[in-house]
Every structure is written in C-alpha cells, then in structure tokens.
C-alpha cells in the first residue's frame, strides 16, 4: 500500500482496497471550484500546492513607513498539512482527504484522530510519539522527506505563523473521528500582529497565548497573570484585550478607552451630573450608573 500511495501510477489506484484521493475545494470571490487528486501522492500534492493562491502582503509596524512583507501561507506549512493528512489517514474508513481553500484560510481534513496525545503537546516541539497509525507509510515519507523526521511538523507550522506575525493554526474543530487543521492566511486582530512585529523575541508559548486572546478563547488564570505582567494584555476576564501600547499603534485608541473605562475624576463628574437631575442616589443606583463606565479589570 505504501508504494502505491506514494509512487504508484494513477491507473493502479484500483489495486488499493480503499479510496486514495485528495479533494480540493476552493471558495473565492463568490465562486466555488476544485479538483480531485489521486496517486502518486509524492507528485500530486505538489500539483495541488501550485493551485493554492499564495501571495505577499504588507504589515506596517508602529512609527515606521517600512512595512514587513510576508507570505499569506508558508509553503512548507501547506505541504505539512497535506502530508500529515496522508500519513495519518485512517484508510480503513475508505474516506477522502479534503483540502478547503477559503479567502482567508486553509482547512485540511482527514479521517482518524491524533494517534498519541493532543496537538497542543506538539506545539513546543518537545513531544515525540512512541507509535504511529501507519508506521510503514510514515517511515517511507520520512525517507523521501515528505514529513519531518523528528516530529517537529506542528511546531514548525506554529513557529512559521509567529515569524510572519499571523494567527496560529489550530485543530479546534477536530473530533474523535476526524482531524481538522485550520491554517489562517490573514490578520485577525492587527494589534496581535503588531505586537509580534514589535517583540520578535517573544516566546512561542506567549505568542500562542496571545493568539488565544485575540480569538476570544479562554486562557488559564496563570496565563492571564503572565501576559498581564509582561504588558501584553489588559481587561477583566473574560473580556481580555491587547494593551494600550498596541492600541495607540493601530488607531484603536477610542475602542481601548471604552474598554479601559473612565478615571476617578470622570466617574465623579458623572455622579454629580446624575445628582443634579435626581437629587438623591442610593449606593445601588450609583453602582448601576457606573458599572459600564468602569474598566474591565476593575
């Protein structure tokens, strides 16, 4: 099976006792189109790579007219997504691998699950699995350099996104029966990208946590304390957001001020105006009056 999947002729696909296809679906400018690729995967994955729209765009850092120019997608990450799907597909289910290209992301779907551990354990590059679902296939793909030899593939995808100041990949839509990789190809929150651009020595761990914040996903209390201490985030859980430093850099000062809330003098002025109208206010009324004016981290 390994030989047929990687280097077998298309006309020999019938010798396999399962489907061996990658379906590419593309959603662009209101149109939907695509293609179907089969064996030999060592060649057809490169053909599919050539169909994916990839281009450079600019990110302007704070107080500079010289932009950072980055690729929408990292070529190695695209191939990693496809090759991992081939390597870890549960072929007994007789299902196809699906690559979906949207305007701002790529999605890779294959049947099966993470054979050992959770994807988050592989982000730092420290975990090495003890066994694989398709050992012969994986060994062959390692030998011809289709996949990483030290199981750094997921780590390298995350590092590449950080190095290009883009949102992190995720497997959040995965289930017990299917692995789904989402690879962003555009900016979600400009503040996040400018934060990475201004702090290129930021650890990958911090970048992943900051990515969780920009996507509105929960992070642990310890992570919140860490990011807050480093001046990367502000706000009151669950309403976390980037710090004032980045807000100024991206013309979101008004939005930041609303999240930051009024200062003491402004709150006092607000109370006095209310007293001029109502003459008397109880504590409960004052609390209600000021609650939406207080900062999220009050």
Feature annotation, model-predicted:
Residues 1-298:
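C-terminal regulatory or interaction extensions
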